[in-house]
C-alpha cells in the first residue's frame, strides 16, 4: 500500500513543471514525522580559468514529514553563473519530496523515491526552464559504512527549454559511521547528459571528494532543550575537463520537534 501511495503522489508531481540539483546525496530514510526542518545548502566552484570559476548555488528550505513515509520541502534556489561580474539571482521555487518505500533494515537495501517540481523565477536574458526530476534513492549498510546512491532523470519544461530529452545525473556517498558529531565520507556527483545521447566522459561533469558529516544536540550548544544541528562540509575535485577544478560544498540543517 505504501509503495502504491508513494508512486501515486510522485506521478502527480510529474505532471507539473524540478529544481536544480544540489550537492547533497538524498537518503531514502529522510522522513522525520513530527519535526520541522530549516535547511541551507550551498556550493561554490573554483577553476584556474576565470570564465569557469565563481559559480555559486544556494538554497533555503523548510520541510517536514507529512506522513511516516513522505517528507516534503519548499525551497528557494539562488544561483550565480561562472565568470566575472555575474549577478546572484533567485532562480527557482521548488517543491521537493522523498518517499520512503521500506523501513530501515526491512530488506536487503533501503529504498526510496525522490521527486522534485521546480518553477523558474527568472526572465529575460537569464530565463531558465522549468524542470521535473524523479528517481530512486537506495542505501545499504555494510559494516560501519552506509552506502547511498541516487539515480535521477530531469526533464525541462516550458518555453525556455535548452533540451527536450531526459538528463541523467547520479550521486554516491560512502560514509563511515564514526560518531554522531563527526563521520567521514566520500562523495561522487556526475551528470551524464541526455539519455541516449551522452557525450564522451571528458565532456561530462564528474566530481569526487571527501565530506565531513555530523550532528549536535541543540541543548549541548546552549540553544534549547530539543532538536539538532546537522552539518556537512566537503571539497569536490573535478575529474574531467568539463568540471571545475574544485567545488566547496556545505549544508546546515536545524531540526526542531513539534
Map each language-model feature to its residues.
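Sec-dependent signal peptide recognition
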Residues: 2-9
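Transmembrane beta-barrel domains of Gram-negative outer membranes and organellar outer membranes
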Residues: 20-258
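Repetitive helical segments and hydrophobic/amphipathic motifs
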Residues: 11-14
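N-terminal signal peptide c-region/cleavage motif recognized by signal peptidases
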Residues: 16-18
Amino acid at each position: 500500500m505504501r509503495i502504491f501511495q508513494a508512486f501515486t503522489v510522485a506521478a502527480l508531481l510529474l505532471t507539473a513543471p524540478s529544481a536544480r540539483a544540489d550537492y547533497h546525496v538524498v537518503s531514502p530514510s529522510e522522513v522525520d514525522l513530527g519535526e520541522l526542518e530549516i535547511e541551507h545548502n550551498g556550493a561554490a566552484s573554483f577553476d584556474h580559468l576565470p570564465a569557469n570559476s565563481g559559480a555559486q548555488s544556494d538554497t533555503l528550505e523548510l520541510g517536514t514529514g507529512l506522513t511516516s513515509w513522505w517528507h516534503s520541502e519548499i525551497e528557494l534556489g539562488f544561483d550565480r553563473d561562472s565568470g566575472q561580474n555575474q549577478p546572484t539571482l533567485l532562480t527557482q521555487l521548488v517543491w521537493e519530496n522523498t518517499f520512503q518505500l521500506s523501513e530501515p533494515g526491512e530488506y536487503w537495501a533501503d529504498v526510496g523515491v525522490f521527486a522534485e517540481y521546480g518553477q523558474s523565477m527568472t526572465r529575460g536574458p537569464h530565463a531558465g526552464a522549468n524542470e521535473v526530476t524523479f528517481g530512486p534513492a537506495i542505501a545499504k549498510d555494510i559494516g560501519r559504512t552506509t552506502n547511498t546512491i541516487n539515480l535521477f532523470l530531469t526533464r525541462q519544461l516550458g518555453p525556455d527549454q535548452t533540451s527536450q530529452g531526459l538528463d541523467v545525473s547520479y550521486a554516491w556517498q560512502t560514509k563511515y559511521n564514526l560518531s554522531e558529531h563527526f563521520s567521514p565520507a566520500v562523495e561522487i556527483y556526475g551528470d551524464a547528459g541526455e539519455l541516449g545521447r551522452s557525450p564522451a566522459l571528458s565532456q561530462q561533469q564528474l566530481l569526487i571528494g571527501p565530506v565531513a558529516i555530523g550532528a549536535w544536540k541543540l541543548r549541548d550548544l546552549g540553544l534549547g532543550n530539543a532538536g539538532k544541528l546537522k552539518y556537512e562540509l566537503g571539497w569536490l575535485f573535478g575529474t574531467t575537463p568539463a568540471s571545475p577544478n574544485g567545488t566547496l560544498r556545505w549544508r546546515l540543517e536545524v531540526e526542531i520537534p513539534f
